Amino acid sequence: MAVEEKNSPTGAAMTNTGILVPSSQQSLPEWWTKTQKFFSRENTITPTFGYFRLLFGTQPGKTDIALIVIGTIAGIGAGIPFPLLGILFGELVDDLNSSTCSTTQAPPGGYQAAITTKVLQVIYVSILNFVCMYIHTGCWSMVGERLVRRLRTKYFHSLLRQEIAFTDTLPSGDVTSRLVSDIEVIQAGTSEKVGLFIGTISYFVAAYIVAFLKVATIAAMLMSVVPIYFLMAFGGGHYIKKYSGRISTHINAATSIVSSSLSHMSIVHAFNANARLEALFAQHLVSARMDALKKAITHSIQFGMLYFVAYASNALAFWQGSRMIADLAEGKPSKVSVGAVYTVIFVLLDASFVLSQMAPFMHIFASAASAGDRLMTTIKRQSAIDGTSSEGDSTISLASEEIELQDVTFNYPARPEVPVLQGVSFKIPPNKHTAIVGTSGSGKSTVVALLERLYDPITGCVRVGNRDLKEINVRHLRGSIGLVQQEPNLLDRSILENIAHGLVSSSQEKHKHLLPTLLGPSLSELTEKIRQGASEDEAVTEQGDVVREIVNLTRHAATLSNAIDFINALPDGLATRVGSSGAELSGGQKQRIALARALIRDPPVLLLDEATAALDSTSERLIQAALNKVSENVTTVSIAHRLATAKDADNIIVMQKGRVMEQGTHMDLVARDGVYAGMVRLQNIGKFSSSSSIMTESTQVDANIDRSLTTDTLLNKEEKLSLEQGVLDEKEKPAQLYMPEEADSLPTEPENEKEKPKQTLWATMKGSFPLIRPNILLISLGLITSIMIGVSYTGEAVIFGHTVGSLSVCRGGPSIRSSGMLFGLLFFILAIVKFAAVIVNGAAFGWAAEKTLYRTRVLSLRSLLRQPLEWHNADGRTPGLLVALVTSDASALSSLTGTTIGVLFSTVANLFAGVILSHVIAWRIAVVLLATLPVLLASGVLRLRVMAQYQKKHQKAYAKATAITVESVDNIKSIAAFSLEQEAYSVFNRSLKAPYKSNMKSVLHGNFWLSLAYSISTLVYALAYWWGSQQILAGMYTQVQFFIVLPALLFSTQSCGQMFALVPDISKARIAASNIVDLLSIKHEGDEEYDKTGSKASAKHTDPRFNMLEDKPRDVEAQLITTTPPSFPTKGMGVQFRNVHFRYPSRPNQPALDDLSINISPGQFCALVGPSGSGKSTTFALLEKFYNPASGSIIIDGVDITKQSGAAFRDTIALVPQENVMFEGTVAFNIGLGARPDVEATQEEIEEACRLANIHDTIAALPDGYNTVCSQDGKQFSGGQRQRLSIARALVRKPRLLLLDESTSALDVESEKHVQDALAKVARKTTIVAIAHRLNTIHRADRIFMIEGGRCVDQGTHAELVERCESYRANVIHQSLDA
């Protein structure tokens, strides 16, 4: 049952369908509802309607309506005063003409009084303009802030509602791109710039109204060009949207590479894969560059045409006006005065100028509409399986119902051509244990997904009792099932919250009253207090009885899952944060937490997909015994590769290639001597000399387990020892093994890094210059054309002043006509010159920006991939935040070589040219007006400071919300399985509250200075006319001089006002540049080559950070380069650990290795076994030099790697991690990543490695074969298939040392046998070290090291350890199918 959100941050309520509806929606007027429906139509495709659909198609509430209406009215009001100024100025021109042409000496006092009156009127207009501008910029800024918050929440909620098939086909990096890039574009296009644009349109319309009232003939002529403006705007918007879509596709693919690389830095380092990943990343960026250039050229043509039409139309107005004034001078009948013509030309010239300044805004609005459409596509999508819906039967109980699959066929949407299930039919009896076994990729996990209704069958059906699964409410169904997945996924919350997630949708009536607390902030606040030092009991008491009940249930579930002791051993206990996807916990710990999450809801149906695969055999046996007790009256479905965990099932279903081969009990299937019996023979661990002894031992162990289940703990003696020493469960520790979890684990980074001095502006500029330097010619061309554009305004002022002077009736008609023709022609020539300059400017800066963006992104990724793991796991350095460095920050920095810097330089050129010309023409007027410039600049600088502080303060705030969204999509199966949509949504909304409130305060503060910067120019108008008229009346200057100086300076001040609209972009670029310079300034080993004396050995490369940057990177996927491989050594490595002590930096009081000493001879196959947390995986971390030991030596081939700089020794080491990682790219690319850094794997070598890993046939059967694209993490492949791909990636390296961390845990017995045979082939030239809990995989090892408590307690062959090592023998017994 969905729960209503009483106080949603968006002012919305969640209906029983899970759809957000504004709380005020029902009271909205009918016209508004119809407007929303109109602009929500999917067939409304023009950019204009797309923009209105963005504003009105997201269910705005009353507040939003009020803000839009008030902001629009204020924007219209802000545009009206300026045409009124034109009327006043026209009357003033008539007065000045009358005084200069009069044959009698008129007293100056009359003219001075009229001027003073008009100046006061200008001041009143200025104040009105400031008020209107502040209102509309404030309102529209709030509209934009509220809109993007609604879009964030709606987009996130829509993602949560979608069926898993949708997220399976979602491009990797798409969510990050939508919530970072698209949201930023939308906010830029729906904030204060909208009010400014409305004001400009209002100005434009009002100007034409005034023009028609004054001189209708000229106004009508100029009115004909208005449709051209709209044609250019919409035509350009269409192409800009087209190219933006293409760019977005390429950038999303590139972002996926960044995201997956930064999320799996251990693999990147282990295989030195950074160069190959960088090349693939660059390849996607190059694909985007041509479309970006086309977009820039389209924009510059659109912008240039606006200038051309504006200036050409003014040329027409000058010419036609001169003819009318000439008629008046010749005494012909005419109602036109010089002032009236001046008013028309002045207001239309200024209106055209200001409208042309809005061209960049139109580009921003078009981009915002395009981004909004991309988001709305997902927001409006109807989910095929909606886990938040109230539809379906919510009364059926699964406790006593039979579950049946009837002739089910199924294909995954990501690979529709590959059949997964083919006519599968079987029954799952109630309250019985059904086990499903079979080869990897046979469809076992798919069956679980169908039972959870994460997918629907293509044909056939799944039934519960006599009801089709589709008839049952999805939330109710999933609430009745406890699921433990093959790869357990946890959310970035505390252990307490993760286990309590199992209660959120529990079908048990006794848990219903807990739901409001589970969805609220109580548990988060509780764990935060505990982490801050409060005792658990005190914090729980403060939160109340419901929270205490949840904590007690959590502890009980943790006890059942054998997790309570390791939780208690953690410093923060249940309050310990698990990190992104549980990265702060080991695999075994995550699996136990996931098991507790399933058991806490006391479900009638339990689905276990390899639920104990990551555990050592003793822990597995303990948990299995516990499961047997709690599942006595539970329908249990388990998937297992370890047949020892399935042999006691009431029914075993054997699957192969998507079909059911046979089913029955263990004894029946063994007797049948079919597929299952063959699997049993493959998995049994050898024969023992004394079977009776083994049976006796087995009986004793079972008795010990039964006794342990009656006590408070389920841990065995070895695990207690490990936990008392604080050793992490790092057998399956990708987080600790390959990534440390705390910020204080930074040996390469000083503790006071957070207090390091802020980059000065000069340091930032100096550090950014190497990024810009290669494009200096393009930038120079852009700067030259920017100066031309800026100076053209001064040229316009010169033409304008002479034109106004030539229209005086004191001159004869022929002279007026010839002057009008001349200056009209000059204006037309100016239009052509400016058109060409704008196009060249846009193309030059656009190309320079794209090349700088490419260079910055590639170098940023290069630097990130070269950082040590400790750096990546420092406080606040999540993959999501680091992705922003490569995407958002690089994009912001590139704007400094694009349109932003172009506008800035043209404005500065305009300012200097206007000031210089004014001083040359009429310095007395200019020097007074120039005194106002510092006031204008000061208002802009103050706003710059406000926006810079705002940007820096909240840079991480919304990144947290983005990280929550990305994490939720990455773990969408867990969220769907446990119906955590509402919980995730609540956490997401809470993360938005703080930045939203602070943003609103910044809006009110920052827009004050923006409004002042815009409005102050009208005060300059007032001062200019007052002082200029005094100078004319005093005979110091002529009208021509005045009307040159006036527009020259006023255009300059107006340009400054426009420049301050770019302050947010400049502020972002400043912060982004500082971030990127900081990143690129980090030194790496190998940046400089030194000889033995410490001096530089070579001065050839002045700064290696900027070397080897290919402008046209090779196609790393399509071209498998055949190279002559170097002569690799033909024998394995020798490895020695001598008295090694090690503690993880984040837990300095807890030893991980305690005087470990082992010796592995070259070419040996050795194994590390022992209980979870004994230090096995830590040895791999030290062998890969992810860490350095506190003391002792690690010697590889006679070289102590702890005393050597660099990590070149990794070139001949290959790692198969427990959690198998795939990157965005083809299968061939993923396998080729394993090749040594100086060699590209050929297709033949890749196929050979795949054959050895028993995955070649599977790949070859795919429609695209080795060119099949892997999504991020390879989710279209099964767990076993991914594991075999990882093995192939390791084998293609031809390693001398092969490290296998549970490398066959997800494999069926047949695949496991193939892999074991392959390893036997390569073992002749390779040293193999394996960590394993499945002892049948290592019982033939040359030497087995028994690791307990961080030290080696015994070593020998399998037979030797069975005879003399009690703990090893116990493990053998637990895994024996004969026991």
From Swiss-Prot:
Residues 69-367, 781-1068 form the ABC transmembrane type-1 domain. GO terms for cellular component: mitochondrial inner membrane; plasma membrane. The keyword Signal does not apply. ATP binds at residues 438-445, 1170-1177. Induction: Expression is induced upon exposure to amphotericin B, the allylamine terbinafine, and the azole itraconazole. Glycans are attached at residues 97, 552, 633, 989. It is a multi-pass membrane protein. Keywords: ATP-binding, Cell membrane, Glycoprotein, Membrane, Nucleotide-binding, Repeat, Transmembrane, Transmembrane helix, Transport. Residues 738-758 are annotated as: Disordered. GO terms for molecular function: ABC-type oligopeptide transporter activity; ATP binding; ATP hydrolysis activity. Residues 403-682, 1135-1374 form the ABC transporter domain. The chain crosses the membrane at residues 65-85, 119-139, 193-213, 215-235, 301-321, 336-356, 781-801, 820-840, 901-921, 922-942, 1008-1028, 1032-1052. It is found in: Cell membrane. It comes from the Eukaryota. One of its GO terms (biological process) is oligopeptide export from mitochondrion. Belongs to the ABC transporter superfamily. ABCB family. Multidrug resistance exporter (TC 3.A.1.201) subfamily. Pleiotropic ABC efflux transporter that may be involved in the modulation susceptibility to a wide range of unrelated cytotoxic compounds. This is ABC multidrug transporter MDR2. It comes from Trichophyton equinum (strain ATCC MYA-4606 / CBS 127.97) (Horse ringworm fungus).
